[in-house]
Amino acid sequence: FSSRLRLMLYATKEILFCKEKYQVLYAPSFRGIEPVIFLRALGLYRKPIVIWHHTAVVNSSGFAREQISRLFYKGIDKMFLFSRKLIQDSLKTRKAPAHKLKLVHWGPDLPFYDHLLAEMPDRKPEGFISTGKENRDVSTLFQAFAATKEKLDLYIAVSCGNINYKNIIDGFTLPDSIHVHYTDGVIPYELAKLVARKSCIVICCLDFPYTVGLTTLVEAFALGIPVICSRNPNFEIDIDKEGIGITVEYGDVQ
């Protein structure tokens, strides 16, 4: 749904008028089920609600918005988060007690990647690759690699959320060593094979308060490929300490 309001209306109708028996309402995020969460907070919806919360819970600006937000989180029975830091930051707001917050580690489908690598016995990893679509910092990425002769392949969506990557990329005059590929229509399996043929994965992200780039990071684990990654304090794993790559500060082009 392009409209969030249309999504909420559709999801709320489907949930409230669902004829199938169920015990728990589970959702990958609260997006679209906000009205049902408020109904739960008011005692008008009886099923427990369990969601993934991709960011830390934060305080809202203004007294009225803060009170509405507190009521909203009262309607969520359990939230899964990707790191302890996200949980710790959420607890500081006092909107969600500890018993509602659960750490769940995000990881790769190892049999999938084992099968993929088994199909590529003669692969000879070479060059750098950057993938993903959420809040990627393509400007820093290009500036950093343009100053080197290293080969980089960027696979990215034309746009994601409020960011139009194509507009940003079109503003650069790129050297022959940097190649951009738009991923619209590219299936994950084919993209994973392209990643597996590279010697290093670059995860260059904007500074957002959640685990930006985590899926790309766990894919690197599964493929055994080192990473150069923005230093995201929300990751559960210390990339430098574990020796799986190096991290750099946000916006660092050196």
Model-derived segments and their meaning:
Residues T12-K21, N59-F80:
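Membrane-proximal helix-turn-helix segments that form the acceptor-binding/catalytic region
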Residues K193-Y210, I225:
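Acidic donor-binding loop of glycosyltransferase active sites
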